[in-house]
Amino acid sequence: MSKRDYYEILGVTKTATEGEMKVAFRKLAMTYHPDRNPGDKDAEIKFKEINEAYQCLSDGQKRAAYDRFGHAAFSQGGGGPGFGNEFGDFMSDIFDNFFGDGRGGGGARGRGGTPGRERGADLRYNLEITLEEAFTGKAETIKIPTSITCEVCDGSGAKPGSKPRTCPTCAGYGRVRAAQGFFAIERTCPNCHGRGEIVDDPCTACQGAGRVNRERTLSINVPAGVDDGLRIRLAGEGESGLRGGPAGDLYVFLSIKQHEFFQRDGADLFCRVPISMVTAALSGEITVPVIDGSQTQVRIPAGTQTAKQFRIKGKGMPVLRSREVGDLYIQVFVETPQNLTKRQRELLQEFDLSASPENHPESAGFFSKVRDFFGGAVRP
């Protein structure tokens, strides 16, 4: 049975670049991989065929020979493009995608890397501040429990005067490759657990861990205008890495205490202020607080009703990393008098008897509509 053309198998032209062939191969390999098609013999055959085609065409010399002589270039014991070690590096990337055992961010040594380099863990710190502190910004000193590199063994985990030996199982790579059928799977070394080294005489200060627990003091700059839930990242301030690996990051999550007077919406502030019935009816001025600690005057016009809102421009919160500032909104509510004296009651009753619909336009309009609805007299 004649073999199919390698270019046809990969779905590329004879002028395809190495990058185009690699993209085509990766797509086909993931489609027909046996793990995605368990028990499918056709997919298994197709997968082998794709591997064979790519190994030939990804090699410059083999591709030149194939372009000139076709499949005959590898016949007569020519050692055709099977599934050899020269193909293993690329397939290892494919297997990482399938089995989730990738090398990103540390762990075991990759090809040509450093044995056992492991990135330190990220840390989280919750910081609560006041609204005033969010307005001005602040420098905060915090203490965090964390792991740092052991100073006695310098992070090696070995007792001073000794040093780790190369793991004989993985030859220092931290990973071992096992054959399963016609392909290989790369796993973390079970002997050294990915370190690539064996510590025979552990450091007594860190018990061979390479790190010790300590409390660290850090200074954090909280900028003006921060909002509730904001996250501040401090690169490299997390746990120390292992065996020369990079440190993790520290994430500071901000929460803002509820304020006694102000509610916040973005850069704007809102404040509810009580006013007397007389001020609402006759007009007047009220003094209201501002977030910067000062006070300002607000003119209340005659006839002001509850829920009337007044805007004070530029008295809100600063916008983070900007020169813009929000506004302050004052919402008034008319306070009903309580604990009245006899004389006060008489005065209010006299006012009520002398009042006309023009004094209460909303009430008059409402009860007029109710009267029309029910078709009868309705007394306010």
Swiss-Prot record:
Pfam families: DnaJ, DnaJ_C, DnaJ_CXXCXGXG. Disulfide bonds: none annotated. Its main location: cytoplasm. CXXCXGXG motif repeats lie at residues 150-157, 167-174, 189-196, 203-210. It comes from Methylobacterium radiotolerans (strain ATCC 27329 / DSM 1819 / JCM 2831 / NBRC 15690 / NCIMB 10815 / 0-1). Residues 5-70 form the J domain. Binds 2 Zn(2+) ions per monomer. Zn(2+) 2 binds at C167, C170, C189, C192. Homodimer. The keyword Nucleotidyltransferase does not apply. A zinc finger (CR-type) spans 137-215. This is Chaperone protein DnaJ. GO terms for cellular component: cytoplasm. It is found in: Cytoplasm. Its cofactor is Zn(2+). GO terms for biological process: chaperone cofactor-dependent protein refolding; DNA replication; protein refolding; response to heat. SMART domains: DnaJ (SM00271). GO terms for molecular function: ATP binding; heat shock protein binding; unfolded protein binding; zinc ion binding. Belongs to the DnaJ family. Zn(2+) 1 binds at C150, C153, C203, C206. PANTHER family: CHAPERONE PROTEIN DNAJ, DNAJ HOMOLOG 1, MITOCHONDRIAL-RELATED. NCBIfam families: DnaJ_bact, PRK10767.1.
